[in-house]
Amino acid sequence: MAQESCDLNKDEAEILKPSSSSSPSPSPTTASPSPPTAQMTEPPPPQSTPPTPPAAAAAASAAAAPQFSAKNCEGILIEVSKKRKLAEATATDANAVVVAAVAEPLSPVLFVNRCNVCRKRVGLTGFRCRCGELFCPRHRHSETHECSFDYKTAGREEIARANPVIRAAKIIKI
């Protein structure tokens, strides 16, 4: 099995296989068996260690660093993505708080458990109309709250679905 290592300099960890003089097996993530340095499109960020030749760096990392298996890299990938998602979530939450603070005085106050007509608290006895609003027992009927739902058209469609038009086949009379 070829040696695998994790490149943690990128945002997402990838499994990179170092090039060797023996016959390299094709990587499932890449189409060409070129070395990992040729696959990188952007330069890696500067590190605190002095730069070393690629062959010496591969030999030093193989001798000194523990070898990572695919499972370890997947765990690191998950941790990195969780951290990134958490950072994005906190950034969007901060933006949402600023937007909510600006928009809060302008937005109307919504009452969830109140009648839409008389603003009486309905609790568990509220009636949800077909127009989507909540009403008390006095205003639950469509005539009392000027309902926008078209009951006549809905009734016609329901009857048409329940009673399809049946036409008899033509009979040839002799």
Curated annotation (Swiss-Prot):
Residues involved in Zn(2+) 1 binding: C115, C118, C136, H139
Molecular function per GO: ubiquitin-protein transferase activity; zinc ion binding
Zinc fingers classed as AN1-type: ranges: 109-155
InterPro entries according to UniProt: AN1-like_Znf, AN1_A20_ZnFinger, Znf_AN1
Pfam families registered for this protein in UniProt: zf-AN1 (PF01428)
Keyword Zinc-finger annotated: yes
Binding of Zn(2+) 2, residues: C129, C131, H145, C147
Compositional bias annotation for Low complexity: 18-41
GO biological process, one term: protein ubiquitination
Coiled-coil annotated residue ranges, if any: none
Record keywords, A-Z: Metal-binding, Stress response, Zinc, Zinc-finger
Sequence segments annotated as region (Disordered): 1-61
Induction conditions: By cold, dehydration and salt stress.
Feature: compositional bias, Pro residues: 42-54
Function: May be involved in environmental stress response.
Record-given protein name: Zinc finger AN1 domain-containing stress-associated protein 15
Taxonomic source organism: Oryza sativa subsp. japonica
Gene that this sequence comes from: SAP15
